[in-house]
Swiss-Prot record:
Lineage: Bacteria, Pseudomonadati, Pseudomonadota, Gammaproteobacteria, Pasteurellales
EC number: 3.6.5.-
GO cellular component, one term: cytoplasm
Subunit structure comment from the entry: Monomer.
Protein name, UniProt field: GTPase Obg
Binding site for Mg(2+): 173, 193
Function comment: An essential GTPase which binds GTP, GDP and possibly (p)ppGpp with moderate affinity, with high nucleotide exchange rates and a fairly low GTP hydrolysis rate. Plays a role in control of the cell cycle, stress response, ribosome biogenesis and in those bacteria that undergo differentiation, in morphogenesis control.
Organism this protein belongs to: Glaesserella parasuis serovar 5 (strain SH0165)
Length: 391
C-alpha cells in the first residue's frame, strides 16, 4: 500500500433545521393556537484514531465529507430530526490543521481518540416559542444556523520513541534491520529509503522501543533539495534522536562537515526539534578497524565541539549494537513520554441561550418566510373556503 502522510479534505457540518409556523386545527377547537415545532440540529463531523490504519490513502481521492442537515420543524409541535453525524477514521498520530487559518485543531495520539472538527448548526425555533399573553397567534419563527465548513490539512506523524538522522547511505536502514524485524530496503546508492518506516527493537523479554527511519537529508534540504525535509515531522514526537554518521564515507567527504550539514538543516526546520536529545553514533567501523575508528571519532568530536557521549558501531556486523540499544532503552525508561495536557475548552463564541434570546427578539415574520403552508392564513381568507376537520 502506498504511504500517504498528507491529505487535504473539506468537511461540512450540517445546517440546523428551520422552525415551523403552524396552528392547531381540530374539530371543536376553532382557535387551537400555535403548534409549530423547532427544527433539528445539524450533524457534526468527527475524526477518530484507528490503530489498524497506517496511511491517509483513503483521503487521496475522496475529498469532501458532509454531515446531514437537521430537518425542519413540523406542525403538531413536532421537532425536526437531528442531522446524522459522520466519523472519519484516520491513523493514530494524525494532526488536523485548519488550512485557512493554519490553526492546529488537535492531535490524535491514541487508538479510539475522537475529535470534533466541524460543529453542526443549531436548530431554529417554531412559532410555539413566541406565544405569550399578548401574542396568542404568533407568525414568527427563526431559521437554523449554518454548520461549520472547513478545509482540513491532515498530517500523519509517526509515533516512535527513537528517530534516525543522517545523510543518505549512512546506514540508518541497516541499523533498523539489525535491531528489529523491520526489513527496509538496503542498497549501495543514495535515497534507497523513500518513505518512513518503523521498527520495534526488543531488549529482553519485556522491554522494547519503536525506532523511525526517514529518508536521508542532504545540504539544501530546507530549500527542497533531495527529498526535502517533509519527512522530518515524523521525528517531532520522538524522545531521542540518533544521529548516524558514516565514519569513513565512500565519497571521501568530511564526517565533521556532514554532521554540521544535518544539524544546520535540522535547525532550519524546527528549533524545537533541534533541541531534542541527540546521540552521536559513528557507523561502519568494520571498514577501518575499531582502533582507527576510535581515533577518527575522537578527532571529529573535538573538531565539532561535541560535549555528549558518542558510540562506535557497525550495523552490518552487529558490533556494539546491543550495547547501544540497551542504553537507548535505559534512557527511554528514565524519560517517559510526557502526555500533553488537554487544553481547557475555550468558551465557544456561539452560545445556545444567547442565540435563542436574540432570535426571539428578531424573529422571521410572515413577510419574510416563504414556507409553502397555510400558516399565514387570515380570517379574510376564510371566505368561500370549506374547512374539513379531522375528528
Amino acid at each position: 500500500m502506498k504511504f500517504i502522510d498528507e491529505a487535504l479534505i473539506r468537511v461540512e457540518a450540517g445546517d440546523g433545521g428551520n422552525g415551523c409556523v403552524s396552528f392547531r386545527r381540530e374539530k371543536f377547537i376553532p382557535k387551537g393556537g400555535p403548534d409549530g415545532g423547532d427544527g433539528g440540529d445539524g450533524g457534526d463531523v468527527y475524526l477518530i484514531a484507528d490503530e489498524n490504519l497506517n496511511t491517509l490513502i483513503d483521503y487521496r481521492f475522496e475529498k469532501r465529507f458532509a454531515a446531514g442537515r437537521g430537518e425542519n420543524g413540523r406542525s403538531a409541535g413536532c421537532t425536526g430530526h437531528r442531522g446524522s453525524d459522520i466519523t472519519l477514521r484516520v491513523p493514530v498520530g494524525t494532526r488536523a490543521i485548519d488550512n485557512d487559518t493554519q490553526e492546529v485543531i488537535g492531535d490524535l495520539t491514541k487508538h479510539g481518540m475522537k475529535m470534533l472538527v466541524a460543529k453542526g448548526g443549531y436548530h431554529g425555533l417554531g412559532n410555539t416559542r413566541f406565544k405569550s399573553s399578548v401574542n396568542r397567534a404568533p407568525r414568527q419563527k427563526t431559521n437554523g444556523t449554518p454548520g461549520e465548513k472547513r478545509d482540513l490539512q491532515l498530517e500523519l506523524m509517526l509515533l516512535a520513541d527513537v528517530g534516525m538522522l543522517g545523510l543518505p547511505n549512512a546506514g540508518k536502514s541497516t541499523f533498523i534491520r539489525a535491531v528489529s524485524a523491520a526489513k527496509p530496503k538496503v542498497a549501495d546508492y543514495p535515497f534507497t529509503t523513500l518513505v518512513p518506516s518503523l521498527g520495534v527493537a526488543r531488549v529482553g523479554a519485556d522491554r522494547s522501543f519503536v525506532v523511525a527511519d526517514i529518508p536521508g537529508l542532504i545540504e539544501g534540504a530546507a530549500e527542497g533539495a533531495g527529498l526535502g525535509i517533509r519527512f522530518l515531522k515524523h521525528l517531532e514526537r520522538c524522545r531521542v534522536l540518533i544521529h548516524l554518521v558514516d565514519i569513513m564515507p565512500i565519497d571521501e567527504s568530511d564526517p565533521a562537515q556532514n554532521i554540521s550539514i544535518i544539524e544546520s538543516e535540522l535547525y532550519q526546520y524546527s528549533e524545537k526539534l533541534a533541541d531534542k536529545p541527540q546521540w552521536l553514533v559513528f557507523n561502519k567501523i568494520d571498514t577501518i578497524g575499531e582502533e582507527e575508528a576510535r581515533e577518527r571519532a575522537e578527532a571529529i568530536v573535538e573538531e565539532i565541539g561535541w560535549e555528549g557521549d558518542y558510540y562506535l558501531i557497525s550495523a552490518a556486523t552487529g558490533q556494539n549494537v546491543s550495547a547501544l540499544t540497551r542504553d537507548i532503552m535505559d534512557f527511554i525508561e528514565a524519560n517517559p513520554r510526557v502526555e500533553e495536557e488537554e487544553k481547557a475548552k475555550e468558551e465557544v463564541a456561539f452560545k445556545w441561550d444567547d442565540y435563542h434570546q436574540q432570535a426571539m427578539q428578531n424573529p422571521i415574520t410572515e413577510d419574510d418566510w416563504d414556507d409553502l403552508d397555510d400558516d399565514g392564513w387570515t380570517e379574510e381568507d376564510d371566505e368561500g373556503v370549506e374547512f374539513i376537520y379531522k375528528p
